[in-house]
Amino acid sequence: RFPYVAFKPNREIGKNVLEIKNLSKTIDGEKVLDNLSLTINPGEKVAFVGPNHYAKTVLFQIISGEMEPDEGSYTWGVTTSLSYFPKDNSKMFGAGINMTEYLQEFSKEDDDNYVRSFLGRMLFSGDEALKDCGVLSGGERVRVVLAKMMLEGNNCLIFDEPTSHLDLESIQALNNGLIDFKGVLLFNSHDHQFVDSLANRIIEFTPKGIIDKMERFDDYLVDEDVKAKRDKAYEGHKGAVVI
């Protein structure tokens, strides 16, 4: 039995997706984001790379509405709808509620069988769907979050390191589901194959701002223009691109 992951947006995305202007954020005295400006367009699947993993997480938290920026702004297009997969999903689940009840909160259909069908895709069958959310393992929580995101049917997905708690079959299923996804994807992952198979745009956080290229990850790694920019950004101390 393999998981089945498919994200089917309920509405098509319009031409305005996301505009980020002069975004800055300092946490515990460290400037995590410094005057970041970006435009995200329809059809883009953007991988965020670079050694500063914290910057990626903070950016995702800000644009998903979980954290306020110190300066700057971001604007989602009117046709966009967002599902967010956080790096730490423990706060999403409380004890005393089972998986079916949890997903019911996000369902447009008032039907347990409809909700359970999404849990079934992630290999929760029968009475497993009544398991208390408070006792789920890390891998089980990830599978419930994926079921929730499929159920929501949104056209823009943010994934912060989704592959960390998944087995190989689940990673492959997620990979296939995101390849087929017709909306906009913003993500980061430590899995090279996952990044290269999905991304059509690479944004690298460097000590001197971002490098932004419309290309696959394997092409980015051998791009002479990127190499020159990285030399400048890392002042000759650059290693391999960190994902």
Residue ranges of model-derived segments:
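Short, flexible cytosolic linker that couples an ABC transmembrane/permease module to its adjacent nucleotide-binding
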Residues: 1-11
